[in-house]
Amino acid sequence: MAWRLDYTDTALKQLRRLDQQTARRIVDYLDERVAARGDPRASGAALTGPLLGSFWRYRVGDYRIICDIQDGLLRILIVELGNRREVYR
């Protein structure tokens, strides 16, 4: 059971701003370790807080990927990504 990866416009813009090597690492991580697994939550961590309950984060080096996992659609929506100092602001 493979999950589909979709990116918001904001996430695509942030991905394009990264250097090519870092962007490739992030995309490879999402393809191989998140979307290909039966349960994408196994390699991530849930964000805490009243409004963040449905969002998950993944760590790739100094970068963080914020996702919304939609079980009914087998879809992982990448909402935001960036350096760990900036992504949570």
Please identify what each model-predicted range represents.
Residues 1-57, 62, 71-76, 86-89:
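Basic, Lys/Arg-enriched alpha-helical interface segments
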Residues 67:
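Short, charged interaction patches at domain edges and termini
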